[in-house]
A protein has these predicted regions:
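Short, structured coil segments at secondary-structure junctions
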Residues: 46, 66-68, 156
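Short phosphate-binding loop-to-helix
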Residues: 51, 58-108, 124-127
């Protein structure tokens, strides 16, 4: 913990990918895609709990084999194309509060489809936000843009929207 902070990592991994079915369990350089995010989270010195939230038993089994905590299978209504990450996070936090009487000071969202983190990325981000928590309530990592504009997002006010709405479908 950083200064007695409880920190939760949430790795959301839906089973019903339309673009690449089963992508979270597909091998990438010798391990399932989801395994990369779990392994990086385990290298953090600050994360108290590494939770995988999924609607898919195969993903849950793989996540547990990598050492993640998977105490529930995500409800179907939170595993659709229209489900928001925000709602998935709220569900996970409600689970901990209601079932385990546990609350967290910070949540780290680790998308399994962004596996190329450096070993210390998570801890550096946590150190930064904890040191400046009176100024910021969230932090996000960014990198050089290599994606097509149709899948890019931009900040608008306190939300995110498609960079090119006319291309997003």
């Amino acid at each position: 913990m950083i200064r007695d902070k409880n920190i939760l990592a949430i790795i959301p991994a839906r089973g019903g990918s339309k673009g690449l079915p089963g992508k979270n369990t597909l091998p990438m350089c010798g391990k399932p895609l989801i395994g990369w995010s779990i392994d990086k989270a385990k290298k953090s010195t600050y994360l108290d709990t590494i939770l995988v939230t999924t609607d898919d038993q195969k993903i849950a089994d793989i996540a547990q084999s990598f050492g993640a905590y998977v105490p529930f299978i995500r409800p179907a209504e939170l595993a659709t194309d229209q489900s928001s990450t925000y709602d998935v996070i709220r569900h996970a936090l409600s689970y901990f509060k209601d079932t385990e009487s546990k609350e967290f000071d910070f949540v780290v969202l680790l998308e399994p489809t962004s596996p190329l983190r450096e070993d210390d990325d998570i801890d550096k981000m946590l150190e930064l936000i904890v040191a400046r928590e009176d100024e910021f309530d969230s932090i996000v990592s960014i990198g050089e843009v290599t994606e097509h504009p149709s899948i890019m997002k931009r900040l608008v006010g306190d939300g995110i929207e498609p960079f090119c709405p006319e291309l997003a479908q």
